[in-house]
Each structure stands twice: as C-alpha cells, then as structure tokens.
C-alpha cells in the first residue's frame, strides 16, 4: 500500500518552469541541460505517473473545498492525466490506456449533494477518461448541515465503506 499525503508530499504543479522544461526536451535538449529545479519537477511528475500506473487499485479521499477538489488533488490529477501514458489520441478521439483497475473515491461534504457536485463528478470523469471504468463513490455528507445527526451520518458512511470494502 502506497499512501500519498498531498499536502505533505511533493506534488509538482504545472507551471511555467515545468512547461518550459518539457518544451526544451521536446526540442531535443538533454535532461541534464535543464535547470536543477526543472529536472526535479519533471522527475517527480514522472515518478507520480509511474506510481499511478503501477497501482492495482486507487483510493482517493478528499473534502469538498469551496464546491471543488483541493488544489493539490488537481495537481496530482495532472500527473496521472498524461497523453501517451494514461490516454492517447486516436482518430475517434481520446482513449484511456489505464484498464483493469478499480478506484474508490471518498469525499466528505458539509452539505448534501448525492454525487451531483462538480468535485465528485470531476474525479470520476478524470478516472473514466484515463480508462478506469469502475469508480465507486462514498460520500460522507450533511454533517455541517445537520450537526445533531453527525454520529448517525458518520456511522452510515462507515457502514457503506464496509460494504464497498467487500467487493473492492
């Protein structure tokens, strides 16, 4: 089991430095000719892509922040949404290359969205895009909306998690 703590571990964000490093490599530059920072960012980016590809199962847990996924989760998704590695372009459109994997997305929401929020749809959409067809979702919802039911809502989520765990 490999655990990534997105706010503790180094997750490179796509920025000007990373883009210019990739551009230099595409133009024929040697990896060692890039700045040390570019080399580190590109190496880490590739390491995270390879880690994702090597995993049999993917579990993503996040809170809904301002009706979206946390920014570090978006940065991680950039490392697993890579043309030529996790998907390819065909004459019929993009095709996912990551097959035979399962994913579980666990998300806590202060309100109740029943999977209709943008964040959970984005997570499932990106995983489907790269070829992961089985994406189970577990929502821990409504605790901010109805704090008097917090224990009950948490127990319901734990029961659902136990049921999902049997087939995951």
Language model regions located:
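N-terminal beta1-alpha1-beta2 submodule of the flavodoxin-like/Rossmannoid cofactor-binding fold
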Residues: 1-62, 67-78, 159-168
């Amino acid at each position: 089991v490999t655990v990534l703590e997105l706010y503790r571990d180094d997750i490179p964000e796509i920025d000007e430095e990373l883009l210019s490093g990739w551009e230099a490599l595409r133009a024929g530059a040697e990896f060692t000719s890039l700045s040390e920072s570019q080399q580190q960012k590109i190496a880490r980016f590739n390491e995270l892509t390879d880690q994702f590809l090597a995993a049999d199962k993917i579990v993503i847990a996040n809170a809904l922040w301002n009706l979206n996924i946390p920014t570090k989760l978006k940065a991680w998704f950039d490392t697993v949404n890579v043309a030529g590695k996790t998907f390819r372009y065909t004459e019929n459109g993009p095709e996912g290359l990551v097959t035979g994997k399962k994913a579980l997305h666990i998300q806590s929401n202060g309100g109740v969205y029943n999977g209709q929020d943008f964040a959970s749809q984005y997570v499932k959409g990106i995983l489907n895009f790269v070829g992961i067809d089985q994406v189970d979702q577990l929502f821990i919802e409504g605790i901010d909306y109805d704090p008097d039911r917090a224990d009950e809502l948490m127990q319901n989520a734990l029961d659902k998690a136990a049921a999902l765990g049997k087939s995951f």
